[in-house]
Amino acid sequence: NINKNTNTNFIPLIILFIIILSIELLTLDFSKFSQNIDYVHDGMLLTPSSNAYFLNKFWESSYIERGLFAQFSPLALWNLFDIKSIGLIHINNLILLYLNKILLVIFCSKIAQHLSSNEFIKKIYFIILSVLSVSLVSYYNLSAFPERSFLFLLFFIIFTNLFSYTKFYFSSFILGLFSVISMLWFIDIGAYINFLLLIILSYFLITKEFKKFSSILFGIILGWGLFITLIPQSEFTEFINITLSIYTNVDYYNGLIYPTPFLSGDARSTRALLLIIFAGILTILIIFNKNMKLSYENRILFIFLFIASILMFKTALSRSDTPHIKVAVGFNLFLIYAASLYILFYFFEKNEKINLQINKFLILFKKKYFNIIVIFFLLNIFILKENIIDLKNFPHSFNNIK
């Protein structure tokens, strides 16, 4: 019953997820996001945007310690809506978190597509992994996938397309453009993505896939060439100076020593390190176990996901408090969910009794209305549990945003 070459159509399920996630967004109590002002973090956005608003300069007007988009997004929103408002910052954050949820769903479909299973198993895997992944993004609390993760998730979605053999290698070219785009997004994300690009280029060079190598390299050169050409030389010079200054000194002025595992009494810091080890063990297990028949695409993807999870953990090492540790483990948790589910489904298929029960469930799953019931039930438990009581906000959602 297993056909490795069959492409499963996940689009209807993805659309259903997007509809439910959109309803969730519109049921939020938006007043809660405008009651308090974070003088430190909001000030880091408002001050550079105000300076650029009056001086019409970016790096020359402020010390940009996060990134162009990270600290000038309020300016773009002020110009877009023709109003200067602190509340627009929070709307921007909510939209990015909403988009992170959608990107996670799409990313899950990419992984499920390359499973060596039949169509129904792929869909069940996709639904469960999507629900678990989306639960890592919270509007009200700190998220394992914060706003800055948006570009990183988009990078990985495009990365999954590198293994489709097309004539023009457009995905490879777009991936190369992320070199400069990521540096203008958040400079820490820029460092992580450029490091991954270096590994990807090395991989394609070693495997002699020169067309993909040259396409990525062309995207990198073209992206940086356009950036250098389009901005004033003085701005580019300040961009280089400030970025190098941040990379050199961030651990000195922002650093908190990471708590000693098991001895510090800080359970979260110890758990975060154990999660990295656990993710590494799972990755090695499913990659080198030939019986699990992990596809080439997912094998490469899981390796790069593990590398990304280690890179992201640098955020926790730079400032080792609870919030920064939490936002640094998103890719780690996602990898654990994806790998654990894969192993679980593998053993289910090997067990005849469990496999029989799964087949009975699949008969119900074929009915579209049952798909809707399953997704809504899971979302209600894992995602909407803190927002479901605010469904009364839905009819007035757009007025509440204003």
List the predicted regions and their residue ranges:
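Short hydrophobic alpha-helices at membrane interfaces in multi-pass membrane enzymes
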Residues: 120-128, 153, 158-181, 210-219, ...
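Hydrophobic/aromatic-rich transmembrane helices and adjacent perimembrane loops
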Residues: 151-153, 191-192, 320-354, 393
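Transmembrane-helix motifs of polytopic, lipid-linked glycan transferases
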Residues: 94-117
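Aromatic- and kink-enriched transmembrane "portal" helix at the membrane-lumen/periplasm boundary
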Residues: 127-154, 180, 184, 312-315
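Start-transfer (signal-anchor) and selected internal transmembrane alpha helices
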Residues: 1-27
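Transmembrane catalytic cores of multi-pass membrane glycosyltransferases
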Residues: 23-71, 76-99, 135-148, 187-195, ...
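Transmembrane alpha-helix segments characteristic
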Residues: 125-131, 293-314, 372, 377
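Signature aromatic-anchored transmembrane alpha helix within multi-pass, membrane-resident enzymes
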Residues: 120-126, 217-222, 346-395
